[in-house]
């Protein structure tokens, strides 16, 4: 009986409830810059508590970043063992096309609770609308769970989300990406704001605002971030612990006076401040508690 309980605990811990709700992944085929941004109605305090591997924050468990080649989001019933994330990471580094990586992920017995989005330059040199992106949405996810992507000039992107207020969250985010002006990061931020403005995560609203001293601003999530990696940035040992150009995050535990309880609006404030200061390289996020079992094979 004890063995059975332990087994069930490990299974449930590895296939935990949704972390990420919506995310935007993008790559500049000309420069090799890759970006991921995301927001969710999971409080910051919940990430270190995950089993069998805790997480520093949303980005730590969700993002897969390979500078100059590709970026991915692993979300919904997130894999807390990190096996899926590391598989995606290693295959992107090899130049495996996104659609083939998705087929590999389908071997996971819990795949119907997962959601994946991948955008990459398959051979590290060329990119086309047909070979550069792929997504998967498990049948066990909620009704409004989907992905949609496309391109705008040299920018290739995909938006994916689950437990959303409606399909318009993803579609309006994608539309905003294509209508935005400026840098790749500007396009990603526009998509993030559109997702938030169109309902975001249906689990969050001003009724569960944990920072009543700040304006709620129609919040649809608790945490948000954007991570930017340039082509020459150093990749990591894990799927996202490299030395990337910029990382801006908002948690429900680090809000300041003058900011918003809506993390996407505060992310915009912090992003604008970063741009105004010259868009300089930021300090990396703190260390990840996740340690791959065989780091020598992940280099």
Residue positions per predicted region:
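N-terminal nucleophile
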Residues: 19-299
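Bacterial N-terminal signal peptides
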Residues: 5-17
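Sec-dependent signal peptide recognition
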Residues: 2-7, 63
């Amino acid at each position: 009986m004890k063995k059975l309980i332990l087994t069930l605990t490990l299974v449930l811990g590895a296939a935990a409830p949704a972390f990420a709700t919506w995310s935007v992944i993008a790559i500049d085929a000309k420069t090799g810059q890759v970006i991921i941004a995301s927001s969710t109605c999971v409080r910051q305090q919940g990430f270190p508590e995950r089993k069998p591997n805790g997480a520093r924050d949303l980005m730590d468990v969700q993002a897969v970043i390979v500078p100059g080649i590709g970026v991915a989001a692993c979300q919904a019933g997130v894999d807390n063992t990190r096996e899926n994330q590391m598989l995606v990471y290693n295959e992107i580094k090899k130049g495996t096309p996104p659609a083939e990586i998705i087929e590999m992920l389908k071997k996971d017995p819990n795949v119907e609770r997962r959601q994946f989005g991948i955008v990459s330059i398959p051979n590290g040199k060329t990119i086309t609308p047909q070979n550069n992106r792929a997504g998967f949405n498990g049948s066990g996810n909620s009704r409004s769970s989907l992905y949609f992507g496309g391109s705008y000039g040299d920018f290739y992107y995909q938006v994916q989300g689950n437990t959303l207020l409606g399909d318009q969250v993803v579609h309006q985010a994608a539309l905003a990406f294509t209508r935005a002006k400026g840098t790749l990061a500007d396009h990603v931020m526009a998509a993030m704001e559109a997702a938030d403005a169109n309902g975001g995560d249906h689990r969050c609203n001003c009724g569960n605002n944990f920072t009543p001293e700040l304006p709620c601003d129609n919040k649809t999530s608790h945490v948000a971030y954007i991570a930017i990696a340039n082509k020459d940035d150093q990749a990591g040992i894990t799927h996202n612990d490299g030395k990337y150009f910029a990382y801006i995050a908002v948690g429900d535990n680090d809000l300041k006076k003058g900011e918003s309880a809506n993390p996407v609006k505060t992310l915009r404030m912090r992003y604008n401040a970063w741009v105004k200061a010259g868009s300089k390289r930021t300090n990396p996020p703190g260390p990840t508690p996740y340690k791959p079992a065989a780091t020598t094979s992940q280099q």
